[in-house]
Amino acid sequence: MAIILGIDPGSRVTGYGVIRQVGRQLSYLGSGCIRTKVDDLPSRLKLIYAGVTEIITQFQPDYFAIEQVFMAKNADSALKLGQARGVAIVAATNQALPVFEYAARQVKQTVVGIGSAEKSQVQHMVRTLLKLPANPQADAADALAIAITHCHVSQNAAQISETRLNLARGRLR
């Protein structure tokens, strides 16, 4: 069993999603958004750090998965996003959580099957995979999709490692 916290970082809205993985089964534990309504960036970053720390304390995750920075057309936006990611990662590492990063295209490919999927498609698939009664809000859905991606990637890595080990032992040909 593992609990995974997914984070969709943003300087104004940071989505989070928490799921439990038992074997191949995924179950929803919680999701939402950390909203920063103040104008100055240092105060927003402090709120993101405090919010992520509170979520970690509440859910006690085993793994922390976060979206990688993409190259935005606006350099200022990319820098702010990078800073928001940074404080979220520091909150995780301060709690000794292993941090995993996934590109947005990889998340969409894993959850929807198309790397260029629309937000509504991600929301629908997250709802379906986690058997939710309604679509989660967009930022929370993205965070849940990041957590789901971590489950799939780590599960595939474990299967590959097991296959390599069996090959080395001469059990597979």
From Swiss-Prot:
Catalytic reaction list: Endonucleolytic cleavage at a junction such as a reciprocal single-stranded crossover between two homologous DNA duplexes (Holliday junction)
Cofactor note: Binds 2 Mg(2+) ion per subunit.
Keyword DNA repair among record annotations: yes
Location of the protein in the cell: Cytoplasm
EC numbers: 3.1.21.10
Protein keywords: Cytoplasm, DNA damage, DNA recombination, DNA repair, DNA-binding, Endonuclease, Hydrolase, Magnesium, Metal-binding, Nuclease
GO molecular function: crossover junction DNA endonuclease activity; DNA binding; magnesium ion binding
InterPro entries listed in its UniProt record: RNaseH-like_sf, RNaseH_sf, X-over_junc_endoDNase_Mg_BS, X-over_junc_endoDNase_RuvC
Subunit relationships: Homodimer which binds Holliday junction (HJ) DNA. The HJ becomes 2-fold symmetrical on binding to RuvC with unstacked arms; it has a different conformation from HJ DNA in complex with RuvA. In the full resolvosome a probable DNA-RuvA(4)-RuvB(12)-RuvC(2) complex forms which resolves the HJ.
The family this protein is said to belong to: Belongs to the RuvC family.
Name of protein: Crossover junction endodeoxyribonuclease RuvC
Organism the protein comes from: Klebsiella pneumoniae subsp. pneumoniae (strain ATCC 700721 / MGH 78578)
High-level lineage: Bacteria, Pseudomonadati, Pseudomonadota, Gammaproteobacteria, Enterobacterales
